[in-house]
């Protein structure tokens, strides 16, 4: 299998949008949730996450505001915008189609010829 870091590079924006679909979160919480859901496959580095957050904010798909964490520390909370929700729907449909196609190819019998 390819290096999970390489696979993550092309999907991190979509995964962040999905994480924020459940409500506002700060960067550390986003990373921990993705790692928990990705079991041993996903490792989210700050050097990847924060550029993704800034990129998504510039595109208008998320917005940020200062708030308090569960431990009452000041944190930047990210929230999905309506445009981000629409983008997530598009990305989800594209990934579902792509994953179905890859699964069909990988599960095809090896004796099939064209």
Task: Give, region by region, the residue ranges found by the protein language model.
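Basic amphipathic alpha-helical segments that dock to polyanions
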Residues: 49-56
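Beta-hairpin "wing" of winged helix-turn-helix
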Residues: 57-74, 79
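Amphipathic alpha-helical recognition patches that constitute DNA-binding helices
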Residues: 11, 15, 75, 79, ...
């Amino acid at each position: 299998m390819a290096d999970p870091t390489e696979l993550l590079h092309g999907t991190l924006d979509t995964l962040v949008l999905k994480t924020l679909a459940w409500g506002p979160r700060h960067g550390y919480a986003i990373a921990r949730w993705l790692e928990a859901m990705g079991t041993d496959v996903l490792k989210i580095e700050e050097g990847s996450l924060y550029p993704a957050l800034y990129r998504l904010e510039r595109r208008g798909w998320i917005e940020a505001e200062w708030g308090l964490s569960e431990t009452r520390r000041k944190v930047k909370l990210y929230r999905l915008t309506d445009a981000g929700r629409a983008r997530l729907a598009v990305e989800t449909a594209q990934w579902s189609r792509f994953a179905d196609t890859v699964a069909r190819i990988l599960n095809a019998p090896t004796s099939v010829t064209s």
